[in-house]
């Protein structure tokens, strides 16, 4: 039987500003990537998101981003590997505190936005991020773009890794995501998202914007919590995965059996 983890970026509200339908989406995902205050989120939002996920048995991970609230962490910054290491250690620590306060454990770490995309193609940056995760807790699972430099860095240092694919993003022929600056970067159709996910899970391939089948490994599927169709996508993808005979379960549970 095919198995897949379904994850979502959550806890991205800030102060009086509400982003996403976290409580509803948590009914359909198996892993939650929780913002740690740099690109989004704040201490109160983090605490509340941890509680919501725990109530539903959803596994949790840190979602560290660049220090860019205005740009939601989606703008590139010129940072050194040492700075990346510090940013990731700091943000893992922030979420870890809230989890420990409730007797809970962290499952994974997934960088956010520009940090994620930069690390996908930059070996030095990805090595620094993987080192940060490993030094904090070598038992954590590192999420990264499927078969990217970040996944390779995690494997080199001895971390468990998860090759991540996206339900709501289009791909280029080199396996990278289409930049958000391009008009065709986002998938808006429920049917298109479902078709892409099932193809990635069952066939290990995705149709690129250039019309080519690109091979990739799918361990976990991401739905962006701030997307306009996030809840609908989560509902339909979960339903259609089941119909296709694909078991949806948290990545850590897959690997403990």
From Swiss-Prot:
A biological process term (GO) from this entry: carbohydrate metabolic process
TM spans (from-to): none
Keywords assigned by UniProt, alphabetized: ATP-binding, Hydrolase, Nucleotide-binding
Phenotype of the disrupted gene, per the record: Deletion mutant grows less well than wild type on minimal medium with ammonium as nitrogen source and cannot grow on 5-oxoproline. Mutant lacks 5-oxoprolinase activity and accumulates 5-oxo-L-proline.
Function: Catalyzes the cleavage of 5-oxoproline to form L-glutamate coupled to the hydrolysis of ATP to ADP and inorganic phosphate.
Quaternary context: Forms a complex composed of PxpA, PxpB and PxpC.
Protein name per its UniProtKB record: 5-oxoprolinase subunit A
Native source species: Bacillus subtilis (strain 168)
Gene name for this UniProt entry: pxpA
């Amino acid at each position: 039987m095919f198995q897949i983890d379904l994850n979502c970026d959550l806890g991205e509200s800030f102060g009086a500003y509400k982003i996403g339908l976290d409580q509803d989406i948590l009914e359909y995902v198996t892993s939650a990537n929780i913002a740690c205050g740099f690109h989004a989120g704040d201490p109160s939002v983090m605490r509340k998101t941890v509680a919501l996920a725990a109530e539903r048995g959803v596994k949790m991970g840190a979602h560290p981003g660049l220090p860019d609230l205005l740009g939601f962490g989606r703008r590139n910054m010129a940072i050194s590997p040492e700075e990346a290491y510090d940013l990731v250690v700091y943000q893992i620590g922030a979420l870890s505190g809230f989890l420990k306060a409730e007797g809970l454990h962290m499952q994974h770490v997934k960088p956010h936005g520009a940090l994620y995309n930069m690390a996908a193609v930059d070996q030095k940056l990805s090595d620094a991020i993987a080192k940060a995760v490993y030094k904090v807790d070598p038992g954590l699972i590192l999420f990264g773009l499927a078969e990217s430099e970040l996944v390779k860095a995690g494997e080199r240092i001895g971390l468990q890794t998860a090759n991540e694919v996206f339900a709501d993003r289009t791909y280029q022929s080199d396996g990278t995501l289409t930049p958000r600056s391009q008009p065709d970067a986002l998938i808006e159709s429920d049917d298109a998202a479902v078709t892409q996910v099932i193809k990635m899970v069952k066939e290990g391939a995705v149709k690129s914007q250039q019309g080519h089948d690109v091979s990739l490994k799918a361990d976990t599927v991401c739905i962006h919590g701030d997307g306009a169709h996030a809840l609908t996508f989560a509902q339909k993808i979960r339903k259609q995965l089941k119909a296709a005979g694909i078991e949806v379960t948290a990545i850590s549970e897959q690997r403990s059996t």
